[in-house]
Amino acid sequence: AWETQDHPVRTDPAGTRRVVAELCAKCLAAPAAQGPPLVGIGLALPSPVDPNDPNRLSQVVLPVWQENLGMDSIAAKYGVPLVVDNDANLGALAEYWWGLGSTTDNLAYIKVATGIGSGHIIGGEIYRGATGVAGEIGHVSIDPQGKLCVCGLRGCLVTLAGARGLEERAGELAARYPRSSLHGKRATVHAIEEAALAGDPLGLQVINEAAAHLGTAIAGLLNIMNPAVVVMGGDLCRLGEVLLAPLRERVRSHTLISSVSAAEILTSELGPRSVAVGAATLVLKSALDDSHLFPKVDIPVGDHGREPQP
């Protein structure tokens, strides 16, 4: 079962908790959900998640939440464990188990939406860093003299290639493209994507600039992490080669040839559900790793985890 609803997660914690509870209830009431019992609930957050204290949220990224996840009542209602991780980490997990990363143990997943983050699989496991902040590529400063970011830095990647940054850039460039389908309108990310796919010069300019900024950040990532696959997910992944061609070009010109030659850069085939698939996969993986936490699961003794690929 699949349910979705847009909501201002960053600014409305109480509303977010209510929406999550409502969507859980709708999914579990759907005909497709009837059958085996619920094992657990996986939750993806647009924020770093400290694996040592997952209920304590980042004061920088989600300041209104007052460092409190507050989802215990949902887990208690259904009597199952709640597992939590960063959304980009879960996108990476989904790609590793079910998608384009299924043939490697080292991959990066870049989620480009309202925010920008990266999730990493290293040696077959999610890499979270010491306190869960690994992968915050959206707050790499691309232009130190650029726009002020919510994190307090200037010129962060998210201000240049995140949803709001794209919309603002389209507005800044509109006067140069009077014949654009976007001219004279409030250009949403969806409208910019549609324009770029149709060959509109303003839409293409905005996407080309965003691809260059993303490519600069990904080039650094390739030099440091050396993944075999980089999967682009989030809102922009449906652009395909319109995004990937300029992005790959920037990466090639800004990284070591040995790093870029070892990496494929692709758009996700799991689509908009990749993070949700990753959240469900985290439940499965957690149950396989420690069945004592999941009393409703009967797991046979043996080797568990993703099946090895030929």
Label the model's feature ranges.
Residues 1-37, 52, 76-80, 104, ...:
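ATP-binding/phosphotransfer module of carbohydrate and carboxylate kinases, centering on a glycine-rich
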Residues 37-167, 278, 282-302, 307:
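Phosphate-binding/catalytic loop of phosphoryl-transfer enzymes
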